[in-house]
Design a protein with these regions (language model features):
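Contiguous, well-folded functional domains in the mature portion of proteins
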Residues: 1-197
Length: 197
């Protein structure tokens, strides 16, 4: 479910996101996460919080919070014009990468990205804590900010309205707890039956 009151963009893969929305010349999933994880496997959602929005963010899935990784950086603005410029706002801004291990989606990565006028990102969930969907994970101090959610593309199907709007480069206004998509049904490794994951 949606993890913040914000403006949302949904992409079925990273290549689509960089073609339509993220124009930073050095953007990569490896740089965003501060690791060498390949980008091919991920579908992603981008949540842009404006200064007037509620700045707490919540668990999008049920799971266990892994060790957060803090990456120091800049505080560039996260408005759409900046995201579509040559600056890699997501890979250069201060951010925290929060892995959440889930039953339905494998490990998902939530990246909280600080922005202009945001002094810090505050984590309220702890490593090893089991969270339920919509439990608070943390908050941004006042200002604009962004969250990026990375999910194994083979395990998730975003809602059609989000994909249609994003394909037209239109952000969708969403609220905490609203549906974003669902787990795909994957073939059972033992037989022909399918089961939700």
């Amino acid at each position: 479910s949606d993890l913040a009151d914000c403006r949302l963009m949904a992409f079925e893969n990273v290549d689509q996101a960089t073609k339509l929305w993220i124009k930073g010349r050095h953007f990569s999933i490896a740089r965003l996460l501060g690791s060498n994880i390949s980008h091919e496997q991920f579908a992603l959602l981008i949540f842009r919080l404006a200064p007037q929005d509620y700045h707490r963010f919540h668990a999008p899935v049920d799971g266990v919070v892994g060790p957060p990784k803090w990456l120091e950086g800049e505080y560039y603005t996260v408005n759409p014009m900046a995201i579509r410029s040559a600056i890699d706002v997501y890979g250069e801004n201060t951010r925290v990468v929060i892995p959440i291990t889930t039953h339905d989606f494998g490990t998902v990565y939530l990246v909280a990205i600080g922005a202009m006028m945001v002094g810090s990102i505050v984590m309220t969930a702890q490593q090893g804590q089991h969270v339920q969907r919509n439990d608070e994970l943390g908050y941004f101090k006042f200002g604009g900010s962004t969250l990026v959610l990375l999910v194994d593309a083979a395990r998730v199907q975003w809602d059609d309205d989000l994909l249609v709007n994003s394909d037209a480069c239109i952000e969708t206004l969403v609220r905490v707890g609203m549906r974003m998509g669902h787990a795909r049904t994957l073939p059972d490794s033992v037989g022909e039956e399918t089961r939700p994951r």
